[in-house]
């Protein structure tokens, strides 16, 4: 089980949709969302929780509601008992979740609008940034972790204007798009 899920969080800017998904993410995710000032940041946070819920149920067969989630001393979220590993990230209009049977880190970054001469160089910088962020999430030591690490790096650049990088000792092959079902 090595999957990466991505969701567009813009539907969460609608209050009814936001409330629906807010009620379905864990208490820790709700508290995090409540601490944020802007609606878009709250939508990103709840979007990360929503894509985690879907990934858990789709990839593992576990019921999201049957699991307890925690945050370790480095701020890395985990499922109690480690039945699987996951990593979350969000940027711009998207939230992503990588889920695996081994430790994993993921990062997504939105490419900024740049003039043509700068775009190629900056895209490389963004790619390196996402690799470093994903590695830091994998190890739980953060962005400034300078330790050497052998891992597969899966980078996806087909999501318009975004780069997604996964770091793991397992191979990831594709990015799975998940669309938030609208509440009835």
List the predicted regions and their residue ranges.
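Core catalytic alpha/beta fold that binds nucleotide/phospho-ligands
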Residues: 1-184
């Amino acid at each position: 089980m090595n999957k990466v899920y991505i969701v567009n969080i813009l539907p969460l800017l609608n209050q009814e949709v936001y409330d629906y998904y807010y009620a379905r993410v864990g208490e820790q995710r709700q508290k995090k969302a409540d601490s944020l000032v802007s609606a878009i940041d709250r939508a990103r946070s709840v979007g990360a929780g929503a894509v985690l819920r879907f990934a858990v149920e789709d990839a593992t067969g576990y019921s999201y509601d049957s699991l307890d989630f925690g945050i370790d001393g480095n701020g890395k979220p985990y499922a109690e008992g480690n039945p699987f590993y996951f990593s979350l990230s969000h940027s711009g209009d998207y939230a992503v979740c990588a889920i695996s049977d081994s430790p994993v880190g993921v990062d997504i970054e939105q490419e900024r609008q740049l003039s043509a001469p700068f775009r190629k160089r900056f895209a490389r910088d963004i790619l390196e940034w996402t690799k470093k962020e994903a590695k830091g999430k994998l190890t739980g030591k953060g962005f400034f972790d300078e330790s050497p690490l052998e891992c597969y790096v899966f980078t996806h650049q087909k999501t318009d204007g975004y780069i997604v990088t996964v770091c793991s000792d397992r191979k990831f092959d594709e990015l799975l798009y998940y669309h938030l079902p609208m509440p009835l």
